[in-house]
Curated annotation (Swiss-Prot):
Located on the platform of the 30S subunit. The keyword Oxidoreductase does not apply. Belongs to the universal ribosomal protein uS11 family. NCBIfam families: arch_S11P, PRK09607.1. Disulfide bonds: none annotated. This is Small ribosomal subunit protein uS11.
């Protein structure tokens, strides 16, 4: 039996201030749908919350299914660089909500940018 799942890529950027979901085709060239925390909550402080991430993921999953995509590979990204390396609270809630909405989850990978001894961090600027 052949696997006839149509795949897309869900790029999830989760910081401690906001969560942004962008779904593209497999090449990454064409954006199918995108959403951020500010589209589903009123308060700025709630943009990064797991609740906002769940609401966003449900809206995104509906639009993705309408576009004919059955499954997504998830790429989670935190702030990175010389900022915090781990993603915010919305990352895990987003993945769980996408799966619950009926999308098949393929691979989950962390694509947070890691510096290879770049610039000095803001916390250790004072010698």
């Amino acid at each position: 039996m052949a696997d006839d799942t149509t795949w897309g890529i869900a790029n999830v950027y989760a910081s401690f201030n906001n969560t942004i979901i962008t779904v593209t085709d497999m090449t990454g060239a064409e954006t199918i749908v995108k959403s951020s925390g500010g589209t589903v909550v009123k308060q700025n402080r709630d943009e990064a919350s797991p609740y906002a991430a769940m609401q966003m993921a449900e809206v995104v999953a509906e639009d993705v299914k309408d576009a004919g995509i059955d499954g997504v590979h998830v790429r989670v990204r935190g702030p990175g660089g010389n900022q915090q390396q781990n993603p915010g609270p919305g990352a895990q809630a987003t993945i769980r909500a996408l799966a619950r909405a009926g999308l098949e989850i393929g691979r989950i990978e962390d694509v947070t940018p890691i510096p290879h001894d770049g610039t000095r961090g803001p916390k250790n600027a004072g010698f």
